Amino acid sequence: MTMALSTQRTTKGKAASLKRRHTRVRKKVVGTAVRPRLVVTRSTRHVFVQVIDDAAGHTLASASTMEADLRASGDDKSAKAKAVGVLVGERAKAAGIDAVVFDRGGNRYAGRVAAIADGAREAGLAL
């Protein structure tokens, strides 16, 4: 199946714009061992969240909508995103992390991205 030429240009333009925005955000947002980076990766269907210590290059906690209990729930995408935020917040607290730097990954701070942040705050993380 081939896409129309105009659709290919639009898709490539959106991906390039997202990468450009993420690069701009990453210049300013750096995670440390004391305050790691909470990274949001969003696809059309799922969201993935990681808490990363950039100094060591390690993932300290993670959660996504691909997990069995969240996948089985019949909630909408925003509700699942909020549940992912709560889950990653609880896992980060269990790992001894109280505060994180929020990295929205080039996405707008609205909808599912904002729901993840709200869920993490509910779990007790300071953003």
UniProtKB/Swiss-Prot annotation:
Highest taxon listed in the record's lineage: Bacteria
Pfam families recorded: Ribosomal_L18p (PF00861)
Region (Disordered): 1-22
Main function: This is one of the proteins that bind and probably mediate the attachment of the 5S RNA into the large ribosomal subunit, where it forms part of the central protuberance.
Subunit architecture: Part of the 50S ribosomal subunit; part of the 5S rRNA/L5/L18/L25 subcomplex. Contacts the 5S and 23S rRNAs.
Gene source species: Kineococcus radiotolerans (strain ATCC BAA-149 / DSM 14245 / SRS30216)
Gene assigned in the entry: rplR
Protein name as annotated: Large ribosomal subunit protein uL18
Keyword field: Ribonucleoprotein, Ribosomal protein, RNA-binding, rRNA-binding
Listed Polar residues bias regions: 1-10
